[in-house]
């Protein structure tokens, strides 16, 4: 049986890490695409040469022409300008919007049946633009944000409680930015809700509030430490988890940026929500109950995303048609 084909648009730090993880997880053959001459070919060759060492069979190829992604089962988009110190995700809007329009056109022509995962920031606006530009069904175009933000929250909680990350569940809703909504009430350690652990004296509300804020600042913290570039290991692993759930029909419940169609009282907007990811893409959106405070935070996050989309439409009015 033919192996799946995974196309990675952008061969930078995230793209290279995606290619490594996809191969090691035996998800399929990998094509790295990048406009930088020689870079995708060089990384593909380097990766191909590690396959005998790691003992897996995957074909790696690099290209600077969109026809190389023809027939891809999964397309993961990282193309665009990365954040620099002092730069917000929103500062990237005008530059990366043009990139999404070009990438969307390439996907529409060469990989119209693919499951598309967008990583490019500002995430919620870029995945919206990518879906509009590609014309693919909304359930086949998602953004990677919530898996990463939730992983950061889980890691910080595991550190706080001195337990394995495997025993911590948590998820983050809303936009991928300063207004994201880490849901402490739905976070657990070994099945025990974090609010109960606060009452048991394991931690304090103040320490959990600090963890919530650190989660919101997670990307910026790494950007400031690196001085040049942004996070790439955890974002790549998060996108691969989404791709694996689709390719293997695992039906994992993952927080992703999905297009809402009435869920949470919203329509025609991409925002982070828990969803079932299987062979049909986004198979179901999970509507969790939000209390008044959580809903207020979620609404603020949605408003921030709506502002970005409006800014996109001013730059590229054609996307609204």
UniProtKB/Swiss-Prot annotation:
Enzyme Commission number: 1.1.1.37
Gene3D superfamilies found in the cross-reference section: Lactate dehydrogenase/glycoside hydrolase, family 4, C-terminal (3.90.110.10), NAD(P)-binding Rossmann-like Domain (3.40.50.720)
Top enzyme class: oxidoreductase
Domain of life of the source: Bacteria
GO molecular function ontology, one term from the record: L-malate dehydrogenase (NAD+) activity
Listed GO biological process terms: lactate metabolic process; tricarboxylic acid cycle
NAD keyword on record: yes
Keywords: NAD, Oxidoreductase, Tricarboxylic acid cycle
Residues binding NAD(+): 10-15, 34, 96, 119-121
HAMAP family linked to this entry: Malate_dehydrog_3 (MF_00487)
Classification via PANTHER family: L-2-HYDROXYCARBOXYLATE DEHYDROGENASE (NAD(P)(+)), L-LACTATE DEHYDROGENASE
Reported function: Catalyzes the reversible oxidation of malate to oxaloacetate.
Listed name of the protein: Malate dehydrogenase
């Amino acid at each position: 049986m033919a192996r799946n084909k995974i196309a990675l648009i952008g061969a930078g730090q995230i793209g290279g890490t995606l290619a490594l993880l996809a191969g090691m997880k035996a998800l399929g053959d990998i094509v790295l695409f990048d406009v930088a001459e020689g870079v995708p070919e060089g990384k593909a060759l380097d990766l191909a040469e590690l396959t005998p060492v790691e003992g897996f069979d995957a074909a790696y190829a690099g290209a600077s022409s969109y026809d190389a992604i023809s027939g891809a089962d999964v397309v993961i988009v990282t193309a665009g300008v990365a954040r620099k110190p002092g730069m917000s995700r929103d500062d990237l809007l005008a530059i990366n919007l043009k990139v999404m329009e070009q990438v969307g056109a390439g996907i529409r022509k060469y990989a119209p049946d693919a499951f598309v995962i967008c990583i490019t920031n500002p995430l919620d606006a870029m995945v919206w633009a990518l879906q509009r530009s590609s014309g693919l069904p909304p359930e086949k175009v998602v953004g990677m944000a919530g898996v990463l933000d939730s992983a950061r929250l889980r890691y910080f909680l595991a550190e706080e409680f001195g337990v394995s990350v495997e025993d911590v569940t948590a998820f983050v809703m809303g936009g991928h930015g300063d207004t994201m909504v880490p849901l402490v009430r739905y976070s657990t350690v070994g099945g025990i809700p974090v609010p109960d652990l606060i009452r048991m004296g394991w931690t304090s509300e103040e320490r959990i509030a600090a963890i919530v804020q650190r989660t919101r600042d997670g990307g910026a913290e790494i950007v400031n430490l690196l001085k040049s570039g942004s996070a790439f290991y955890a974002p790549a692993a998060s996108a691969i988890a989404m791709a694996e759930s689709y390719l293997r029909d695992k039906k994992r419940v993952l927080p992703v940026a999905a297009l809402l169609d009435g869920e949470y009282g919203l329509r025609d907007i991409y925002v982070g929500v828990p969803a079932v990811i299987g062979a049909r893409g986004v198979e179901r959106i999970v509507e969790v109950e939000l209390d008044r405070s959580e809903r207020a935070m979620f609404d603020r996050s949605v408003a921030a995303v709506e502002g970005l989309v409006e800014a996109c439409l001013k730059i590229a009015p054609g996307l609204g048609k």
